[in-house]
Amino acid sequence: MPLTLGNITYSNCFPVHAGLIDGAVAGGPAMVEGVPSYLNGLLERGEIDVSPSSSIEYARNAARYRIIPDLVIGSRGPVRSILFLGDRDPRDLANATVAMPSASATSVVLLKVLLRKRWGVAPRTFWFDQAREDPFARGADAALFIGDVALRPELYPERAVRFDLGQEWWDHTGLPFAFAVWQAAGGSDGELRTLHRQLLASRAYGLEHRSALAGKYAEHFGFPAAFLDAYWRDLSFVLDDAMTEGLRTFYRYAAEIGEIDAAPDLRWTERGEG
């Protein structure tokens, strides 16, 4: 059977998978689509072999996974698609209630890290469905919105205070942030080397043809082509040394606030040749 590869349905994943989706890279794996939390579950249960998966998922199940080198969905400053909204300064949320989107994993832990480490508070939280619910109507004092919902102001309530968590992390640590890394739960070493080579070629195609692809897929994602082009331009898709240091720092903070037992060692698949 061919490898199965998860594909996050948000537009932020597209540049890495563009060559596979657009047919420029042949012989790729079978693809399964979903939001990050859904793909995390499939990966954990062994129902898919590889996926761009929430970086916190690796930390929670590091014994099961290996990270595919060089690939990330990350930011070096503002990310645009991870927004924290409310009506007061975050430092005033100690006795407040914060709504967390059920579609998220890493972004929720990132917000908890920032609330504790940057703003010095630990408010109550509850889950909400960002596609269907107004969390402020349920009594939230602040709420986190992620993905393509966060990119569409008409889909979330207007609030007085707005923070981009990519920028907040950068300001707090001076490091990039890795929201998702490609993780392998199955597949032989040879299959994973081949997939690594295919993914690098797919990413190269996506970045080289970014503007043209933004025009071609604008209707699919529901954004103007110029907006999509700029959004992809500002994201980071290369897991370099600085991004890896940001990932390690995130894991250390997550352990310090009790979201994971300990910061895991990073285990990698082998690189494909070429």
Predicted regions and their residues:
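A conserved helix-loop-strand patch within extracytoplasmic ligand-binding domains
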Residues: 72-132, 169-170
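Short loop->beta-strand "edge-of-pocket" segments that line small-molecule binding or catalytic clefts
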Residues: 2-9, 91-107, 196-202
